[in-house]
Amino acid sequence: MSLEEQQSDDPAELESGVSRGDELAELLGDLVVGREEHLNAPGLVIRPDEVQDALFKLRDEAGFDHLSCVTAQEYEDRYESIYHLTKFDDRTDEVSVVVPTSKDNPVSQSAEPVFRTADWHEREAYDLVGIQYEDHPDLRRILLPETWQGHPLGLDYDQDRPQIATLREHANPLEEDHRAGDSNTMYINIGPHHPATHGVLHVETVVDGEQVVDLESDIGYLHRCEEQMCQQGTYRHQIMPYPDRWDYISSGLLNEWAYARAAEDLADIEVPEYAQIIRTMGAELCRIASHMIALGTFALDVYGDFTAIFMYAMRDREIVQNILEDLTGQRMMFNYFRLGGVVWDLPEPREEFFEKIRDFMDGLPQALEEYHDMITSNEILQARTVGTGVLSPEVAKSYGATGPVARGSGIDYDLRRDDSYGYYDELEWDVVVEDGCDNFSRLLVRMREVEESAKIIQQCVDLLEDWPEDERNIQANVPRTLKPDEDTEIYRAVEGAKGELGIYIRADGTDKPARFKIRSPCFSNLQTLPEMSEGEYIPDMIASLGSLDIVLGEVDR
């Protein structure tokens, strides 16, 4: 897409004829030293020593209160950090703050004083690309061991060089701080192999008696540089299998849609309406399966309920998994989406497939009523969740929390409605929000979202049943080899089961991305754990971790 086309089709064009980029550039004044045009947003180039001034102005005067993610990359002549900003109350209003730094001295101001979520995102940028961030409170590696040599996404990184890092060499600042001076506290390792972490997560915890006084999540045990793997694959054929492995529990189609949406907008591919309905139905089935396992494992964590809620939830999830297997041919790693549509039509005989879905939907209201009864009448669960793990809306926004974590704190934000895609804007459903801001509210959001997903699925089934046979077009006409224009950039996101799952792609004119960035909702949501846990008891911290519903494959990528 040419620059002229980008400007004429700019969704942020104002009635006065002044573009959104011009308006924001005028607001920032001399802070802006250049302009770029990304497909999703205007790009404002800022000096590396004026990042905080620019971000404070955009947040406080223009209302950009959501830092979605930070993309770092290396060019032949410079390094670059991109801060993807938007608003919780207007998701379609976006701006990219582009911060170039020199090859000889890749140092930039940290955004952490403005947005707390920049803490982990900038640590990841330093870890994988090598950019230094001044004023960062704790700039060290986050996904790789501290003793790792080089930065894997750098242009001169030697991928063939073997490296070994022992546990003894792995830095643990929290333990050192605890041991310094006189202290009555105790240091506890929770994980990396522990049932309550639901994956390979190391929660470094300092306690005073039974109360948590300090906490840090040590991640990266499942890191395999998925972004680099996607950069080595072709748009058309080789990238799509990877998203299934990020949130590998139940959210495969939701993950695939994140990549599909970004690549389709990048290459200007229009998906047929029939395929969009199939995508929407499949995505909501995945959402139900994901929320069911979140509900069951949360009850298991909080009061050891293995026989009732946990097994009931796993039973219902199993029914959904069987439906998804009928649809995609795979039980877990679906690889069902294709750029421009889906790989094949609904299974035959269609009547049996629809009947299986309807049977499950007919029994779902009674099942959810039983879940509600078991949860609201359980005194142990109520005591452990109501008023614990409190996350205020202001703190949640600063950390970039999204999905049920944000909506459980009263933040009315859902990309299916606020930046609609697929077939969601044609269907009747509601965004679920709870204002309790605690562990119980996050649990209720997921249970109520299952009801809304069921509404969406039923409407999709009704549409698909009556769809004329000669109009069942499952794929657009997509070139065998996709080569988007050089230096075309885009960030697109979908509403995953855990929150905002976003993809940034920069094209270089070849059939492979020059940069592929994954914005993981679990990565941002996990940052909030210390805010929810410090001052609470250890069992409450376990409940707070469970209420985040993280999957380590998506956190570590």
Swiss-Prot record:
Location of region: Disordered: 1-20
The record's principal subcellular location, in a coarse class, is membrane
- State the name under which the record lists this protein: NADH-quinone oxidoreductase subunit C/D
Which UniProt key words apply to this protein? Cell membrane, Isopeptide bond, Membrane, Multifunctional enzyme, NAD, Quinone, Translocase, Transport, Ubl conjugation
- Pfam families to which the protein is assigned, alphabetical: Complex1_30kDa, Complex1_49kDa
Acidic residues bias spans = 1-13
Compartments in which it is found: Cell membrane
What's the domain of life for this entry?
A: Archaea
Family per UniProt?
Answer: In the N-terminal section; belongs to the complex I 30 kDa subunit family. In the C-terminal section; belongs to the complex I 49 kDa subunit family.
Q: What is the E.C. number?
A: 7.1.1.-
- Is Ubl conjugation included in the keywords of this UniProt record? yes
**Enzyme's top EC category:** translocase
> Would the keyword Mitochondrion turn up in this protein's UniProt record?
no
Give the source species.
Answer: Haloferax volcanii (strain ATCC 29605 / DSM 3757 / JCM 8879 / NBRC 14742 / NCIMB 2012 / VKM B-1768 / DS2)
Q: Which GO terms describe its molecular function?
A: NAD binding; NADH dehydrogenase (ubiquinone) activity; quinone binding
**What segment(s) does the record annotate as region NADH dehydrogenase I subunit D?**
184-557
